[in-house]
Amino acid sequence: MKKCLVLCMIFLTAVCLSACGASDRYDLTEETFFLVMTNMQYYPEQYVGKTVTYDSFTYRLTDVEGKEYMCGVRKCSSGYGCNCGKDTIIGFILDYDGVIPEPKNQSEDTSDKTWIHLEGTLPSAKKDEIKIYAYNGDEIDYDTVETVVFYHFAVSSLTPIEDASGLAYYVSK
């Protein structure tokens, strides 16, 4: 019995070390996407330089000064990445030398998007705070400015996803 308990403790320690950053690779799946991205917000240093793979849709973000950022994102529950109290997007600003497919149905609340599979790294733990105009329903509210926070993602591989029927547009815990 004691030997079984020791083996269980060793196994649990190995699992905990893997979950706490001992991995050199993070494959974000439908089940782990939200948890890993949330953890990354609090402990980005453990992900810097590590290989990360994930599926997302393309999203063009424009700040209040007109600068555009191409992002790979998913939609998620309120509270992640902004203080707006509304549902928001979760993902990265994509740094890629190749062509990133153009967003599709960006302003519509639908899963009919331009989906891509990405592999790359988080080059630094520095967050970009981007000031954007708020949305009021389906319209932009130019009187209200919100701040969203993103990390950069150095893309080493980008593959368009033709059939995204198995992917959730909206991710949650």
Language model region names:
Residues 15-19:
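C-terminal motif of bacterial Sec signal peptides marking the signal peptidase cleavage site
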Residues 11-12:
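Repetitive helical segments and hydrophobic/amphipathic motifs
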